[in-house]
Amino acid sequence: MEFIINKINNIKNNNDNNNNINNNSNNNNNNNNNSNNNKFKFKYEFEFGYCYDVNLYEWRFIQDYETVPLKLNGILSNDEYNSILNIIGDVYDKTDKYPHVTYLLSIIMMVLLCMLPSVMAIHSNLNSYIQFVLFDDIFILITFILIPFLFFLKKKVIIENNYVIKGLKNRSIKLNIEYYKFKLLYFFFLLLWVPQGFLQSLIYKKRVLNEDFFNLKISLFILLGIDLIFILFAIWNFLLFTKLNRFLIKDRRDENILITLNSNIKKFLSPMEFYLTCNNTLNFFLNNNDNHFFPIDLDDPNV
């Protein structure tokens, strides 16, 4: 009888030990899950805000690291701070007080460049052999220039900047940027240039060499479709940057026009940044009178 009782007690003890082991393992799993969740929580979050005050455009780019408010309490190193400034500088020249002018001129130059093959195709007064040689040489030259530039643009904008952002993320610092639409717009039009030039080259070969290795009508329709994208984009941008029949460059100092343009850009393309703010631990406000950042004491009852 005692043997049976001892056996039962041993079984109970073993079950209790197993339960304790399971509970401990569950607790460890929960702790690991919690640590993994906390791992991706940011202590600090930096954002680029939009400029709504036309008088503060020159402050879109914040100060040097030595003059930044409280030096960000040592959160960012000098190299990290300069990396962020380089990301901002990829969008606009830091000395440009009117980003809308820079943006519009860049769009105009881009559209004119991309429509060059169509202009050459329409110009039919040239001798066909001259057209063929001239266009083929230009297309080959520009293609060999653009293809490396496409890879450089991808590396510079997407890979390098993401490397900086991930590096900050590992230090629990989040950096929010909203300008990829603007940069990828260039990337999109450069990609359109290559098939357009290739089709145009085939058309010239068809005219000069009279080769039947492709369908001329289909190529022409595709080419016209690409050109139509360029034309519609140019018209859309002209309407976007036009206010009451007055062109941006002519009245670029008109505050009402600039405010309207700024609103349109933010709504449609979001290419512009203004200043760097830090949420959570650090908080700043911008004094409109003397254009300086001041820290906000969240514990102050007057705030």
From Swiss-Prot:
The keyword Lipid metabolism does not apply. This is Putative uncharacterized transmembrane protein DDB_G0285385. It is found in: Membrane. The chain crosses the membrane at residues 102-122, 132-152, 184-204, 221-241. Signal peptide: none annotated. It is a multi-pass membrane protein. Keywords: Membrane, Transmembrane, Transmembrane helix. GO terms for cellular component: membrane. Its main location: membrane.
